[in-house]
Amino acid sequence: MTQVWTVVVPVKRLGVAKSRLRGALPDQPHEALALALAVDTVSAVLACPVVADVLVVTDDPAVATETGMAGARVVPDRPAAGLNSAVRHGAATAGAGWIAGLTADLPALRPAELAAALSAARTGPTSRRYLPDAPGTGTVLLAAPPGVPLNPRFGGSSAAAHAASGALALLGDWPSLRRDVDTATDLAEAARLGLGPRTALLCGTAAPTAGRSV
């Protein structure tokens, strides 16, 4: 597979990230869980065979250190104006080329599923493409071809917002990519798919072996 994609992953400061997950793991600090979700997500993206570069947009020192050590390019969140501004900033930093914005809460993500979705985004109409989350209301992935602005609309009811903005939905069976984690129930569902090593350690579950790498 040809590595053509730059993937932008925005990550909030850990103290305010994933607020609905606070208390999901009573024996673990909330910040540790938020960091684990981000690190497992970024690690899976780095392992994706069609991804050439991963930009993590964050102002959190721990996120910057850990994802940078994993191999991501860390971009300070200069706008500091929310998720969509961070994605736009990362895309502008990346420059021309195939670009995607991805949420940082996909701890079960399989690199092969991300590769399949990104490859699907390069087929058909030359336009922005988005992938709804598991419930179908949010968005986990937004992709654009060279020369087309991402124009992100992440947030509540973002799937409908992206569709209304002219983006086309991606269709495929990619459960680990669509399983974002906002609540304790989401985390349990991600665990059934197989968590990445950092999140699995915190949850006290066995990390998947070869299954997650495909």
From Swiss-Prot:
One of its GO terms (biological process) is F420-0 metabolic process. Gene3D superfamilies: Spore Coat Polysaccharide Biosynthesis Protein SpsA, Chain A (3.90.550.10). Its EC number is 2.7.7.105. SUPFAM superfamilies: Nucleotide-diphospho-sugar transferases. The keyword Zinc-finger does not apply. Pathway: Cofactor biosynthesis; coenzyme F420 biosynthesis. Keywords: GTP-binding, Nucleotide-binding, Nucleotidyltransferase, Transferase. GO terms for molecular function: GTP binding; phospholactate guanylyltransferase activity. Phosphoenolpyruvate binds at residues 139, 155, 158. Pfam families: NTP_transf_3 (PF12804). InterPro entries: CofC, MobA-like_NTP_Trfase, Nucleotide-diphossugar_trans. It catalyses: phosphoenolpyruvate + GTP + H(+) = enolpyruvoyl-2-diphospho-5'-guanosine + diphosphate. HAMAP family: CofC (MF_02114). Guanylyltransferase that catalyzes the activation of phosphoenolpyruvate (PEP) as enolpyruvoyl-2-diphospho-5'-guanosine, via the condensation of PEP with GTP. It is involved in the biosynthesis of coenzyme F420, a hydride carrier cofactor. Belongs to the CofC family. This is Phosphoenolpyruvate guanylyltransferase. It comes from Salinispora arenicola (strain CNS-205).
